Amino acid sequence: PEALIPQICSTIDATAVHISADFSPFGLRRDSAVAAALAGAGIPLIATGSPYLVSPGRVTKDDDTPYKVFTPFFNRWRAVGWRAPAQSGPTAASWIDPIGVTGLPPAADPPDPHVALDLPAGETAARQRWAEFLADGLATYASDRDRPDKPGTSRMSAHLKFGTIHPRTLAADLDGRDGGAGAYLRELAFRDFYAAVLQQWPSSAWRNWNANFDSIEVDDGPGAEAAFHAWKQGRTGYPIVDAGMRQLLGSGFMHNRVRMIVASFLVKDLHLPW
C-alpha cells in the first residue's frame, strides 16, 4: 500500500487520503508507512473514526486508566455511547475504484482458500444478510447462538472485519428491539473491549495478556507435531473438535462456540502454544 496509494493519488490528483483509523499493531505499522510515503508528495493521511462502536481508548475508568475486566468496561461503554450512522449514501461522494485507474500494476489474485465460501462480499450482501438475521434470527439469538447444530448466529463477523457494514448500523437497528437484541449488543461490546485491550497492550497479540498462563504446559517434538496436524485436519478423535475443524476446512467458516472449543482443546488438552 505504501507504493500503490501514492501512485493512485498521483494519477487522480488527490490532495488528501481519508481512512478509518486502525488500532492493531499491524494496522498502525501499515498506516505509518503509507503516511510517510504520502508525506513526500505533500498529501496528508487523515484517520477518522474507527470500525468500532466506541473507539479504543475512549472507555476508561474515572482515573483514565484502561479496563482489564469486561463487565465494568461494558457498563461504562454503554454510558459513553456512540453516534448514529451517518446520513449518507452511494451518491454522497464520487467513488473511485482503483481497478479502473490507468497505469497501475494489475491487482494480485487472492490466494485460493480451496473451499467454496458461502459468504458473498460487499455492502449490499452485508445489508441483506443483516436484514435476514433481524427478521429470522434475532428473536432466538440469545439461546440459539450456543447451538452449533442450528444456524443461530448472524454470520456478520467477516462483514465487520472487512468494513462492508459498520457496527453503528447494527446497533441502530437493534435499538428498541426485544429478544436477542441485548445479547447481540453485548457481543459488539466484546469486540470493542478486545480492540481496546490490543490498543492498550499491543504485546497481547503475541504473548499471554494474563501472565498466569505463562506457566501452562507446552509439548514439543514429533508427538506435538503429529497432534497439531491431527487437530488441523479434524482427526483428533474428539467429535465436536473434529466437526468444527472439518467445517472450517470445508466451508471457510466455524461456529463461534466451536471456535472456543477447538482453541481451548489445542492449548489445554494438546498442550500446544496458541
Please identify what each model-predicted range represents.
Residues P1, A126-F133, L170, I240, ...:
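Alpha-helical packing segments of well-folded alpha/beta enzyme cores
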Residues P1-W82, G180, R246:
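Trp/Phe/Arg-rich N-terminal binding region typifying the photolyase-homology
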Residues V17, R155-M156, T169-D173, A243-G244, ...:
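A general alpha-helix detector
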Residues D22-F23, S50-P51, T164-I165, F190-F193, ...:
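An acidic- and aromatic-residue-enriched active-site/binding cleft used to recognize and process polar
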Residues G40, R177-D178, S204, S251-M254, ...:
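Secondary-structure transition/capping motifs at alpha-helix termini
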Residues D64-S215:
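Glycine/tryptophan-enriched, flexible segments
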Residues A195, H229-L272:
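C-terminal substrate/ligand-recognition segments
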Residues S203-I240:
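Helix-loop-helix junctions that connect adjacent transmembrane helices in secondary transporters/permeases
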